[in-house]
Amino acid sequence: MVLEGNPEVGSPRTSDLQHRGNKGSCVLSSPGEDAQPGEEPIKYGELIVLGCCEEGGEETEAQRGEVTGPRAHSCYNGCLASGDKGRRRSRLALSRRSHANGVKPDVMHHISTPLVSKALSNRGQHSISYTLSRSHSVIVEYTHDSDTDMFQIGRSTENMIDFVVTDTSPGGGAAEGPSAQSTISRYACRILCDRRPPYTARIYAAGFDASSNIFLGERAAKWRTPDGLMDGLTTNGVLVMHPAGGFSEDSAPGVWREISVCGNVYTLRDSRSAQQRGKLVENESNVLQDGSLIDLCGATLLWRTPAGLLRAPTLKQLEAQRQEANAARPQCPVGLSTLAFPSPARGRTAPDKQQPWVYVRCGHVHGYHGWGCRRERGPQERECPLCRLVGPYVPLWLGQEAGLCLDPGPPSHAFAPCGHVCSEKTARYWAQTPLPHGTHAFHAACPFCGAWLTGEHGCVRLIFQGPLD
């Protein structure tokens, strides 16, 4: 049932709001729908932060432009520097709540702008306010939806935010200094998941604040839709990319789109904060798929479905691959020392003495040595003693965030210039995937640390001396 607008809020006229979904007033969750005590709640999916890093991480030699010896790596490769705590984590599982908290549009009011604060005084009433001018605003009230669960994502640490996300700066570092300002909105986006199979997840730009409101100011991009409803975009936008062919061995990057406050799909604006919206893409939806990327202008999230995670390698498989690689006893072709990938449990303080190092231009793997610097080519340039190619020389680290991997293939390739190691198909997919950067630029980056990829291919096949090759 669509309710008539309340004239007491100062509305000269009220329009009925048409919306999709079941009609009717608030209905509580049906008995028996929720997980019983001791049962695992139904998982809708997981969000994984790409290249999650925090302040205090040290730069790699390649990023710092120095070659002075082994040093701590900057990325945290599947975990925040201070550890995953509370709502601030490197990944978050979205599971069915004990009670539905979703909302859906209900009534639209046209009111005088000065009366907006009075109209929105009810904290229990979710609403979106569109300021059209100094004298005219449109308020869309939302009502409880017993069929969906809502999860909110943003920079704010207030209780209504389920997943607190901070900026991941280009190159695998974190924004530092007093002048560094976050470009992620405090209430960036919201995801609504159906509580019944197939548990579809849909993404919407903007989240509700502590007063259960979303405000689109006079300068925000907003418009009236052909059916008389309202829609708009947030200041820096919420971009989504669905991979072609799903998130699997045959995946290819899709096309980046922008999601509106009401969940419609548009082509990208000329720049991130431009007031002119893109064109409506009618044959695409805001439904998240396995491998969908969500960019919040400062951090990029990967959505994995439960079915997709079953196909991904497990941490046990990654550990077995590490042990298998070490069991082959690869050697440094110059120093003839045995190389070994360190255990993730050892931590990331500094490269181990047996740590493999790679010349990222050619892929030849060596042990660490302090010679071969080519200062005339720059402080980070070294000459490979086998093929004489000059380029960055970095330690190799096995990628430990299994959810970022397309397949359980052997660790045969490394990203350039950071040195994170994964399977060939995983490396090639991410090297071909442009991630948003700044107001209108795109650049491929390592999914484990966020470092911008360099070179012709962005990754290199590793050439070991010994049985591994």
Curated annotation (Swiss-Prot):
Phosphorylated by IRAK1 enhancing its E3 ligase activity. Residues 1-39 are annotated as: Disordered. The modification Phosphoserine is found at residue 11. Its EC number is 2.3.2.27. GO terms for molecular function: ubiquitin protein ligase activity. Highly expressed in brain, heart and testis, and at lower level in kidney, liver, lung, placenta, small intestine, spleen and stomach. Isoform 1 is not expressed in lung. It catalyses: S-ubiquitinyl-[E2 ubiquitin-conjugating enzyme]-L-cysteine + [acceptor protein]-L-lysine = [E2 ubiquitin-conjugating enzyme]-L-cysteine + N(6)-ubiquitinyl-[acceptor protein]-L-lysine. Pathway: Protein modification; protein ubiquitination. Keywords: Immunity, Innate immunity, Phosphoprotein, Transferase, Ubl conjugation pathway. Transmembrane segments: none annotated. GO terms for biological process: innate immune response; negative regulation of extrinsic apoptotic signaling pathway; negative regulation of tumor necrosis factor-mediated signaling pathway; protein K63-linked ubiquitination; regulation of Toll signaling pathway. One of its GO terms (cellular component) is cytosol. Interacts with TRAF6, MAP3K14 and MAP3K7. E3 ubiquitin ligase catalyzing the covalent attachment of ubiquitin moieties onto substrate proteins. Involved in the TLR and IL-1 signaling pathways via interaction with the complex containing IRAK kinases and TRAF6. Mediates 'Lys-63'-linked polyubiquitination of IRAK1. Can activate AP1/JUN and ELK1. Acts as a regulator of innate immunity by mediating 'Lys-63'-linked polyubiquitination of RIPK2 downstream of NOD1 and NOD2, thereby transforming RIPK2 into a scaffolding protein for downstream effectors, ultimately leading to activation of the NF-kappa-B and MAP kinases signaling. Belongs to the pellino family. This is E3 ubiquitin-protein ligase pellino homolog 3.
